[in-house]
Amino acid sequence: MQFRDLSADDIEVRVQSVKDTGCVLLLYKNARCDMNILDETVGCMNWKREHCRDNANCIVSIWDEKKEQWISKEDTGTESNTEAEKGLASDSFKRACFNWGIGRELYTAPFIWIPAGNVQINNKKTFDKFSVEKIKVENKRITGLSIINETLKKRVFLWMKEEK
């Protein structure tokens, strides 16, 4: 089973750390993205999710018509800082979907450093919002990426994988 690559609209950007000289960004997908891709690819009636171990684990199962049985993949999540139980369930679901291959290209993202001139920093904090402008994926690997600082309304990161 092959899931489509993530589009720029599927990917969210968050600030991982801030220094006086700039900030580091991370790319991620949310649970709604996974649900949408599962619905698109296998149909809304052909997949299911189950949580166990107090939401720490999630099992994502897809119906295999040829085998006439559910095929399952499972993973464990971690609590979020805001809503522990909901965050745990969401994280375990997203991780189980990574096991199916949804969004696995995010593991190949480059290091994203935004220098201080492209982000508003005050006391080693920023409230700037960022988004993926464009992404290019080849063979499940990110080969091109551009990021916009939505607050400043400008492109702040542009990267293309070097040809070998």
Residues covered by each model-derived region:
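Flexible, active-site-adjacent loop/turn segments at secondary-structure boundaries
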Residues: 1-4, 26, 100, 104-105
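N-terminal, Lys/Arg- and Ser/Thr-rich interaction peptides
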Residues: 1-24
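Short histidine-centered catalytic/ligand-binding loop motif
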Residues: 16-27, 76-83
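Positively charged, aromatic-enriched nucleic acid-contacting surfaces
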Residues: 31-164
